[in-house]
């Protein structure tokens, strides 16, 4: 997903927390646009969508992009060595994933990160005082799990990660939460933690579905009318 006008804020966010030479995984790298935030020698983009990986490799040939399997069980593994990376970058990713799967991913991230490594993340978030943005995000975004900062934080804590909030960027109807997460050896695991879809999502889902698929229905209808007039 792409949110307009977030570019400068993202460059500033990463520029303050990444140094050349640190090994980076861009998890859910999409079409590769965020690769430019990092040095090609430091970067691996991981993505489940084969066509997006192919497009990324065409657009950014100096960078490394790989197709990865879905993580659905505790036995599934990402194709990355233990304790091998300094940073895992998550940009507009987690809100597409239910909390059960997020927790499985966090365990994998814990395995992959070096000691002292960190997760740098950007996610749309619900802010109680920002009702208009909360509605707009859920109307136009395909992600079903836009939750609050507190819920994101609790989800990370349930897998022994501490959260350091960095900033909230407000742009084009979105509240984009920037944060850093680090593993805490003193933390505890809560296997029973989970989050649900918010009421915002439940009420706006029909509108979102119409906006996502309605244009194709309209296009088919227009083509049908044109063909009917031609023949």
Place the predicted regions along the sequence by residue.
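A conserved beta-strand element that flanks and buttresses the S-adenosyl-L-methionine
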Residues: 89
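Conserved alpha-helix/loop element of class I SAM-dependent methyltransferases that forms part
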Residues: 4-20
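Conserved class I S-adenosyl-L-methionine
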Residues: 21-30
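C-terminal alpha-helical "lid/dimerization" subdomain adjacent to the S-adenosyl-L-methionine
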Residues: 121-159, 163-178
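Class I SAM-dependent methyltransferase SAM/SAH-binding core
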Residues: 30-76
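Juxtamembrane boundary at the C-terminal end of a transmembrane helix
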Residues: 225-231
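A short glycine-rich, Lys/Arg-flanked "PGG" loop and its adjoining helix->strand segment in the class I
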Residues: 103-115
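Core SAM-dependent methyltransferase catalytic element
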Residues: 167-207, 216, 220
């Amino acid at each position: 997903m792409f949110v307009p006008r977030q570019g400068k804020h993202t460059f500033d966010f990463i520029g303050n927390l990444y140094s050349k030479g640190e090994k980076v995984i861009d998890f859910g790298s999409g079409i590769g646009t965020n690769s430019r935030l990092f040095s090609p020698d430091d970067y691996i983009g991981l993505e489940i969508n084969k066509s997006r990986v192919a497009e990324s490799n065409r657009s950014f040939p100096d960078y490394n992009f790989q197709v990865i399997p879905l993580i659905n069980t505790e036995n599934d593994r990402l194709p990355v060595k233990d304790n091998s990376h300094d940073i895992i970058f998550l940009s507009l990713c987690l809100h597409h994933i239910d909390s059960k799967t997020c927790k499985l991913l966090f365990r994998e991230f814990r395995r992959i990160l070096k000691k002292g490594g960190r997760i740098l993340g950007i996610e749309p978030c619900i802010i109680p005082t920002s009702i208009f943005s909360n509605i707009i995000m859920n109307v136009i975004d395909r992600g079903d799990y836009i939750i609050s900062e507190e819920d994101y934080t609790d989800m990370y804590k349930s897998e022994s990660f501490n959260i350091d909030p960095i900033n909230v960027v407000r742009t084009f109807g979105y509240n984009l939460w920037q944060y850093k997460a680090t593993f805490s050896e003193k933390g505890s695991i809560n296997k029973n933690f989970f989050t649900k879809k918010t009421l915002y999502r439940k009420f706006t889902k029909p509108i979102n579905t119409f906006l996502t698929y309605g244009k194709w229905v309209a296009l088919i209808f227009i083509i049908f009318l044109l063909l009917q007039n031609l023949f």
